[in-house]
């Protein structure tokens, strides 16, 4: 079916060291649809246009100004998707990864710490309505864990924990070869936990984070 749709093609490479008939090797076809990815950080939003085998064709970034709102965030996302569509119209879908906490089931960015002005943003619904394309939404660390499972050091592992350390601490869990999601659609989150109620005041307003 994928061959009929032009997504994959047979590779001419032959495996001569294998007993019996040579297996058919499939590769992503040159004319296969592309995919667009969006990554939401506290300071910027990034977009990438890539092939199905993860060859990056174009990247763009919009830095956030002061007084960011949910409406402005969605508009920035639309601007970036439009820029990607200038290069390629044949798009299979759009993936959105965001800092958390997020509501994965409903595609909503909830209330990330130190992400002032951004609360309960239905970014998945907004992008889906704008472009009429399949849209996938998840926590950024879950997406990172999936990338490690598919393309990185986790390919041979069925169970592992990804620990992301930047200006916060986050995690993604792969269990039984699949990214773990709770039944409520919320991600596993290690970051931004108060461990000393008498500690230094954090930018979130709590102490000892």
Regions found by a protein language model. Give the residues of each.
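Conserved phosphate-binding catalytic cores of ATP/NTP-utilizing and phosphoryl-transfer enzymes
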Residues: 10-35, 139-160
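Basic amphipathic alpha-helical segments that dock to polyanions
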Residues: 1-9
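Gly/Thr-rich phosphate-binding beta-strand-loop-beta motif of the actin/hexokinase/Hsp70
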Residues: 22-57, 162-175
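Glycine-rich phosphate-binding loop of actin/hexokinase-like ATP-binding domains
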Residues: 156-209
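Hydrophobic alpha-helical segments, especially N-terminal targeting/anchoring helices
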Residues: 50, 102-103, 173, 181
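Glycine-rich phosphate-binding loop and adjoining helix at the ATP-binding site
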Residues: 59-83, 87-159
